[in-house]
Amino acid sequence: MSGCGKSEEFGVGPVKEEMKLAPVDAALYTKGELIFTTKCVACHKFGSRLVGPPLKDVTKRRRPEWIMNQILNPLEMTQKDKVSKELFAQYLIQMTFQDVTQDDARALLEYMRAVDEGKLTPKE
């Protein structure tokens, strides 16, 4: 990946430092599951496309910093991040800002990690 700096891998937004992830935290992913069912499920499923892209294995394809920035800063990500621009071109819909805190975004990330690691079945 010569020429790709951390900032490109992290996307555009408040998360600028590399995240050190511990094993999946049950309390955190439980909070994330609740947030997902109230703010994300209208547009996202894990196994198939709904309005937005399917989320299955997103934590294996994208860095945690990128996922956090996409959740926290979707408009600017679509304007400035290469991958987010490609997703916009493919799905023809702008991810909306869901007014989540950085702690909420971290819980959502943990929920996605738990689903991707097979620790729970997604709420869809």
Residue ranges, per PLM feature:
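C-terminal motif of bacterial Sec signal peptides marking the signal peptidase cleavage site
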Residues: M1-G3
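Electrostatic cytochrome c docking/interface patches
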Residues: K6-I35, V51, E124
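Sequence context of c-type cytochrome heme-c attachment sites
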Residues: M19, K45, K85-L87
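Short pre-active-site segment immediately N-terminal to redox-active cysteine/selenocysteine motifs
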Residues: L28, F36-K39, G47, V51, ...
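Gly/Gly-Pro-rich "capping" loops immediately C-terminal to redox-active cysteine motifs
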Residues: Y29, E33, K45-N73
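Sec-exported extracytoplasmic/periplasmic mature domains
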Residues: T37, V41, K45, K60, ...
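Axial heme c-ligation environment in periplasmic c-type cytochrome domains
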Residues: V51-V58, L75-A105, L120, E124
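Charged catalytic carboxylate motif
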Residues: W66, D104-A107
